[in-house]
Amino acid sequence: MTSSIKSDAPQFLLDLDNCSSLPPTPPKTASPGNSKMKGFNISDLCLDLDSSTSSSCSVSPASSFHTRSESVGQQQSGRNSPVSSSTESPTKRPKYSYNALIAMAIQSSPFKSLRVSEIYKYISSNFSYYKNQKPLQWQNSVRHNLSLHKEFRKVRTLDGKGSYWAMTADLGTDVYISNNCGKLRRQKSKVAKFPPMQQHFPIPQLPTQNIHQLCMQNPQILATLLQNMYLQNMQNLQNIPMVPGFPIIPVPINPTSFHFPKSS
């Protein structure tokens, strides 16, 4: 009776009897998105490299922030790139200024913005000199440089309970880190240099002497001065190009109509 029922049952039901012989299902792991993010750092968003790649790609954190022209000149002169943090002496201060260290820290983040505490962590993690120094001294200098230089700006969070620091210029194009002094430099903008403005049409000037005294001595001198000014202005108006909608209509002046009153 039982065998007849089994023979009449669908095939997928018969396959359920053999489930005990199958290998057990591996345990389901919790999704990283559902787990609580403890100790989150913005550097956790970067993909981890394997050991072979990371060992072969050990470079200085500042090596990618120099200008292309400086890197080419560096190869031609035979100078080496800046040493990595692993080979630095913990007692020797790095040549990079505070604004250069801040720029490197901000540029290394995926969102190109960091909190002040994250900037501290980047500097102490990549440069062992600051790890052995008193935090109060160099961290105070970092905060001072953030508010001093125009290359950095504070970005408030949406809830208004904190802030991030970002750069106003792109590191590597607008600004760069100098290989010579390790300071943050701004690229020189190519501004067209125009020649000094020249006055092509001189303005007629009256003599510096007292006009009243001249006219009292010679009443005809006023008419002569006005006539000379009129002729010079007419010559200048002929050289000015006509602008559509703004015609230049010179007003003729009759020098003979001016008379200086005679003194009694």
Swiss-Prot record:
| Residue numbers spanned by region Disordered | 15-36, 50-93
Alphabetized, the UniProt keywords read:
Cytoplasm, DNA-binding, Nucleus, Transcription, Transcription regulation
Origin: domain of life: Eukaryota
Instruction: Identify one Pfam family in the record.
Output: Forkhead
Alphabetical GO CC annotations of the entry are:
cytoplasm; nucleus
Describe its function. Answer: Transcription factor. Plays a role in embryogenesis and later development, perhaps acting redundantly with forkhead protein fkh-2.
Protein name in UniProt: Forkhead box protein pes-1
Query: Which gene specifies this protein's sequence?
Result: pes-1
